[in-house]
Curated annotation (Swiss-Prot):
<dbReference type="InterPro" id="IPR050075">
    <property type="entry name" value="LeuD"/>
</dbReference>
<keyword id="KW-0456">Lyase</keyword>
<dbReference type="InterPro" id="IPR000573">
    <property type="entry name" value="AconitaseA/IPMdHydase_ssu_swvl"/>
</dbReference>
<dbReference type="GO" id="GO:0009316">
    <property type="term" value="C:3-isopropylmalate dehydratase complex"/>
</dbReference>
<comment type="similarity">
    <text>Belongs to the LeuD family. LeuD type 1 subfamily.</text>
</comment>
<dbReference type="GO" id="GO:0009098">
    <property type="term" value="P:L-leucine biosynthetic process"/>
</dbReference>
<dbReference type="Pfam" id="PF00694">
    <property type="entry name" value="Aconitase_C"/>
</dbReference>
<keyword id="KW-0100">Branched-chain amino acid biosynthesis</keyword>
<comment type="pathway">
    <text>Amino-acid biosynthesis; L-leucine biosynthesis; L-leucine from 3-methyl-2-oxobutanoate: step 2/4.</text>
</comment>
<protein>
    <recommendedName>
        <fullName>3-isopropylmalate dehydratase small subunit</fullName>
        <ecNumber>4.2.1.33</ecNumber>
    </recommendedName>
</protein>
<keyword id="KW-0028">Amino-acid biosynthesis</keyword>
<dbReference type="InterPro" id="IPR015928">
    <property type="entry name" value="Aconitase/3IPM_dehydase_swvl"/>
</dbReference>
<comment type="subunit">
    <text>Heterodimer of LeuC and LeuD.</text>
</comment>
<dbReference type="GO" id="GO:0003861">
    <property type="term" value="F:3-isopropylmalate dehydratase activity"/>
</dbReference>
<dbReference type="InterPro" id="IPR004431">
    <property type="entry name" value="3-IsopropMal_deHydase_ssu"/>
</dbReference>
<comment type="function">
    <text>Catalyzes the isomerization between 2-isopropylmalate and 3-isopropylmalate, via the formation of 2-isopropylmaleate.</text>
</comment>
<keyword id="KW-0432">Leucine biosynthesis</keyword>
């Protein structure tokens, strides 16, 4: 997972609330366990509407999604995060996230920052005044800036640290590789052990 500090990219004013994971990626697309190839599945039903915001030219190549409250509710689907990342999003800002979606996001390198509903309105207004405008999201400062509008967002310290360091679950484990090896070497040989996977 790459380190996350600052993202500069097109922002989307996603004026929808209560967006569940089935709306983010319908269950019919959950047949694979790879992390890529899901960009076409993102918001699949809504993208059939030519007027849907992600179909508008100004928002092509967007990396920042400013959503309404209660984003990512419903079932736990890592695929929802994979679809957002595969489409190109690095950041989702919302007044409220489902806890399990937020947890899945941080582990996959998607920043989910909590903003107030008032700040969401301010960001939406700035984006809609200049469709295609670039947003700057600074994880170090915990700020999002669109034009003259700058807001602060909240993110838990642990997830913020993992994103700044670029640590997914495997990389986090590998930080302790020496200690793990020392433990395994000192452990009695007669005890059960896990054999390495041969690829």
């Amino acid at each position: 997972m790459e380190k996350f500090e600052t993202v500069n990219g097109v922002a989307v004013p996603f004026r929808r609330s209560n967006v569940d994971t089935d709306q983010i990626i319908p269950a019919v697309f959950l047949k694979r366990v790879t992390k890529t190839g899901f960009d076409d599945a993102l918001f699949h039903a809504w993208r059939q509407d030519p007027g849907f915001i992600l179909n508008q030219e100004a928002y092509q190549g967007a990396t920042v999604l400013i959503a309404g409250p209660d984003f990512g509710t419903g079932s736990s689907r890592e695929h929802a995060v994979w679809a957002l990342r595969d489409y190109g999003f690095r950041v989702v800002l919302s007044p409220r996230f489902a806890d399990i979606f937020r947890g899945n996001s941080g582990k996959q390198g998607l920043l989910t920052g909590v903003i107030s509903e008032e700040d969401a309105e301010r960001l939406w207004g700035a984006i809609e005044a200049q469709p295609g405008i670039t947003a700057t999201v600074d994880l170090v400062a915990k700020t999002a800036t669109v034009g003259e509008v700058q807001v602060s967002f909240d993110i838990d310290h642990y997830t913020r640290w993992r994103l700044l360091e670029g640590l997914d679950d495997i990389a986090l484990t590998l930080r302790d590789e020496v200690r793990i090896s020392e433990y395994e070497a000192a452990r009695a040989r007669w005890r059960p052990k896990t054999l390495p996977v041969k690829l």
